[in-house]
A protein has these predicted regions:
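N-terminal/domain-start alpha-helical segments
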Residues: 1-123
Length: 125
């Protein structure tokens, strides 16, 4: 599965990309919402991992733009924000899951697989 990682922190981005690639995923990593929009136009992704604290357009705005633009794949918010209001807002805005940093890579991969199964079920109904 090809994944788009949208994370502006270089250390976390590299570590997440490497960990997921070692688990067998193809990972494209961008550091801004603007780059994410371009990547989604150019490639087909099974899953997007979206940080909320991005430079310029933040993750919540990016999520809304992606969904309005027709992206129907799985989107998982991966963020340090752990408030219930952030979780509810993100899920209501169209995220398929919400994962708080720091996270375990095995759990992240399991949640990605789960979200992709749900999305696949939606498209076959």
């Amino acid at each position: 599965m090809r994944i788009l990682l949208i994370e502006d922190d270089p250390q976390l981005g590299r570590a997440t990309q490497m960990g997921l690639e070692q688990a067998g995923y193809a990972v494209d990593w961008v550091q801004s919402a603007e780059s994410a929009h371009m990547a989604v136009r150019l490639h087909r992704y099974g899953c997007l991992l979206l940080d909320l604290a991005l430079p310029g357009e933040d993750g919540m705005q990016a999520l809304a733009t992606l969904r309005r633009g027709g992206y129907d794949g799985a989107i998982l918010i991966v963020t340090a924000r752990d408030q219930i209001v952030d979780r509810v807002t993100g899920l209501d805005a169209g995220a398929d899951d919400f994962i708080v940093k720091p996270f375990d890579l095995d759990e992240l991969a399991a949640r990605m697989r789960s979200a992709c199964r749900r999305v696949a079920g939606r498209t076959h109904e």
